[in-house]
Curated annotation (Swiss-Prot):
This is Small ribosomal subunit protein uS15. Part of the 30S ribosomal subunit. Forms a bridge to the 50S subunit in the 70S ribosome, contacting the 23S rRNA. One of its GO terms (cellular component) is cytosolic small ribosomal subunit. The keyword Ligase does not apply. It comes from Roseiflexus sp. (strain RS-1).
Length: 89
């Protein structure tokens, strides 16, 4: 589901590389992870919501591609991000 403005600002502040960074792979993956977690909770309550399930799969795919990009560019940042977000890889 959509993130509230203050939640999004807090996530960006936690993962940004510099004061105006809003688009680095680390920030994007963190935001996608929060949206994915919200959709997972939604689907636990509404298991037949196939439209949201498709959106979840698209978000997971986008996050996977961003993580692959980050792993190819900066292995150390990739490992640190996975540890802080608690992702399996």
């Amino acid at each position: 589901m959509a993130l509230e403005k203050d939640e999004k600002t807090a996530i960006i502040a936690d993962y940004q590389m510099h004061s105006t960074d809003t688009g680095s792979p680390q920030v994007q993956v963190a935001l996608l992870t929060e949206r994915i977690n919200g959709l997972i909770e939604h689907l636990k309550v509404h298991p037949h919501d196939h439209h949201s399930r498709r959106g979840l799969l698209k978000l997971v795919g986008r996050r996977r591609r961003l993580l692959a990009y980050l792993a190819s560019r900066d292995k150390e940042a990739y490992r640190k991000l996975i540890d802080t977000l608690g992702l399996r890889r």
